[in-house]
């Protein structure tokens, strides 16, 4: 169903939409790592959670995900209405050694050092 405040992101650059969004509803996509840097609320809508874990598996323990895990639409709506949030700081501390906004500089310096040594 169409709704003026819901964007179908199938053909959109998700990173451009991050700045416009207030929260993210995702499955266990790796997009949560990118979005977590923004310190915004996330919800995980996984109606097929048990099948997904059995068939595909998850690289990260789902208990570490920084948001409410919702197995049905009612849980998702309730989580949003109650503003149920996860421990975003703990998640970032586990997965990001550096959180100072200087990662690009570090990568450029690393590449420069590698190139300098190879000449």
What are these regions (language model features)?
Residues 100-119:
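C-terminal alpha-helical cap of glycosyltransferases
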Residues 30-96:
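Catalytic binding pocket for nucleotide-activated donors in carbohydrate/polymer assembly enzymes
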Residues 1-33, 38:
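Donor nucleotide-activated moiety binding/catalytic core segment of transferases
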Residues 14, 73-74, 104:
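Residues at or immediately preceding the N-termini of alpha-helices
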Residues 5-8, 66-67, 98:
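Short N-terminal micro-motifs specific to bacterial/archaeal maturation
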Residues 1-2, 70, 103-105:
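Conserved catalytic-core segment of nucleotide-activated headgroup transferases in glycan assembly
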């Amino acid at each position: 169903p169409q709704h003026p405040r819901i964007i179908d992101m199938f053909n959109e650059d998700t990173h451009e939409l991050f700045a416009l969004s207030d929260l993210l509803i995702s499955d266990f996509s790796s997009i949560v790592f990118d979005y977590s840097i923004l310190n915004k609320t996330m919800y995980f809508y996984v109606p097929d959670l048990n099948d997904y874990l059995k068939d595909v598996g998850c690289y990260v323990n789902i208990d570490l995900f920084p948001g409410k895990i919702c197995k049905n639409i009612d849980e998702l709506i309730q989580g949003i209405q109650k503003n149920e949030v996860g421990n975003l700081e703990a998640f970032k501390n586990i997965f990001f050694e550096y959180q100072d906004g200087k990662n690009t500089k570090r990568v450029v310096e690393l590449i420069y050092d590698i190139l300098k040594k190879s000449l």
